């Protein structure tokens, strides 16, 4: 066991998020997570484990955090150091055992604040925000709502591929307004979804695709990739770049 340095600030890796799911807590990664973290991660953890991680969402050194953990969990300093150390800069995913099976955690769960770079944030999560009554670590479907959403911006397309399942012939009489889409994006962000996928038709044929994508990027829930058949032009590339999108643009043939 590697003993952590008491004078350093350790934080919950900003590429990971905790979402209370009534009977457990969802631990998931952001889209666009770098290779030093576990990409496309989603597991359920015990609420008490989420509480422990919540103590590392503040700007304070371990020597300040440790007594707080000891008081909350009624454990000695030695016990808490042993527990916490396994989660600090772990190079590979780890797991703990419970009566409902193994609980998995991604790599580098807790990291030094100075190594978080521009992504560093202090969410200041409250321990009492993970209260639960009946533990359930096995049900796959989330209790609090979906983790992934998909918006079909338009069913219009620039091609007519025989293998495509999309209905591109039906004329949509009352499409969602851009304002309503922005409201839905805010709701999705408030719900703490992992990402919102964009599909078509051809999403770049929607008149306000740039506004929609930019808002998803701003809220950290942009799709991991966008598929298109649009002829790539300098203007299109510039527009995508201006949204701040850092994901993959897949050119389908």
Language-model regions, residue ranges each:
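Radical SAM/AdoMet-radical enzyme domain recognition
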Residues: 178-199, 206-253
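Hydrophobic packing positions characteristic
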Residues: 1-19
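Residue-level recognition of the GNAT/N-acetyltransferase active site
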Residues: 57, 154, 206
